[in-house]
């Protein structure tokens, strides 16, 4: 059967970020889509509005009459009744990334990989291409207001994809341009060692055809260490390290950055980015280098970067008022991401009090990185650590591991006003009290984590709005 003859696709775990994005892409491409998840909500409601059939819970009969079943790495195929029924009935069962790889066959693929920043960089590339008159197909593991969602089905030849390294998913993709945005220890439950993770990044980059290109962000030491193993055409980007594409004359001011890009010896001054942080400038350099490789005029690329307005849960300002109180929601869940997010708040609003509200994600990650979280959070004026968000893990498998490990690490690193508050209501009250404290330079309530801390951020934004300023979901 050819993909074009496939009529109905059933997706197990359709409510997840990556799965809902591919469901949206399939719907917009004309496929009939059904899907199941243990819980439903805003994401599945939106898919239903686009025509998907959504089931709450998993039942064998829900895969009847479908042509293929797609599932994510978070689903155990041997423990899911729908997958078992599909296999018994002779219905093909594939992982999400295999389906994505099939959809890429008809396009020139631009794939952004990295342990950090890939969502933002993918969205920047998509914004630049659209603003330059291209009509790309786009799939991102996050929500962009500019794109009005996480996917775009375009008529042009380019497909821009966020390439996830978890479970080696990105190795099933076929990029023409591969962006290596960052690389450090992550997903050790998949890889076991950093060396094994690096080998997968090398394999991913070398999947690029001889006429393609690999964009490497060399400010990351582990990327510098693997460059010698990449046998494709390379472009390097960096701020701290010598590179083909660099940034200088950097000025940060209240959530905006202006700078000069120097690409292959030519200066392009006056670049404006409407999101804070040096890490976002580095992301912009990767996007700019990608645009140059596609032959787009630099002036159009710069204009496109100026239109980039951020992603939901990537330093998303959910509330601000005239007193300088801000509620910011960010997906940061790795120590490097937490450090960059706190630093962005500090550099963008140097006179403000920064109160970090951090929810550790996964017991295994909390155990592995507790000390690193301590250093990353210690630059905030106050730190509240929530209970660990378990996701796919169980507390009983990690005795003694909780948010207290992170709180103690923050204290050892010199952090001020540190508290571990596992009770949600107590945490809500404490954060609201912080927001009510007068501060001459304002107060930033900075929520970070990959779990449901975003729900608390939304509630705080609603509580403090009081009719002044603006609150956003």
From Swiss-Prot:
One of its GO terms (cellular component) is cytoplasm. Pathway: Cell wall biogenesis; peptidoglycan biosynthesis. Its EC number is 6.3.2.8. Keywords: ATP-binding, Cell cycle, Cell division, Cell shape, Cell wall biogenesis/degradation, Cytoplasm, Ligase, Nucleotide-binding, Peptidoglycan synthesis. SUPFAM superfamilies: MurCD N-terminal domain, MurD-like peptide ligases, catalytic domain, MurD-like peptide ligases, peptide-binding domain. ATP binds at residues 114-120. It is an enzyme of class 6 (ligase). It holds the Pfam family Mur_ligase_C. Its main location: cytoplasm. One of its GO terms (biological process) is cell wall organization. Cell wall formation. This is UDP-N-acetylmuramate--L-alanine ligase. The lineage of its organism: Bacteria, Pseudomonadati, Chlorobiota, Chlorobiia, Chlorobiales.
